[in-house]
Amino acid sequence: PAIRNGWYVVCDPDADLVPNEFVQVCLKDGRCTIKEFVGINGGVLSLLSVNGGERFFFEMDEVESITAITDIVPPSQHRQEHPYSH
């Protein structure tokens, strides 16, 4: 899988959503998931499973937020402090 247990996912709410890249989607019912962004067409959000294959569709009125994932970091590369915080 692209994202393994214990790895860190970095989300950027200001980044553009790019087709074929990963996003975090939170629904108004409280569920959140990470999927591959396909696009939004006719008020319907299209996503693919991270593992590929299965396709998901959500009406945009069900969606609370869509956030671009800008990095996936293995535990060995994780830094507790932000590198630009000093």
Name the predicted role of every residue range.
Residues 1-86:
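Acidic/glycine-rich C-terminal interaction modules and beta/coil loop segments
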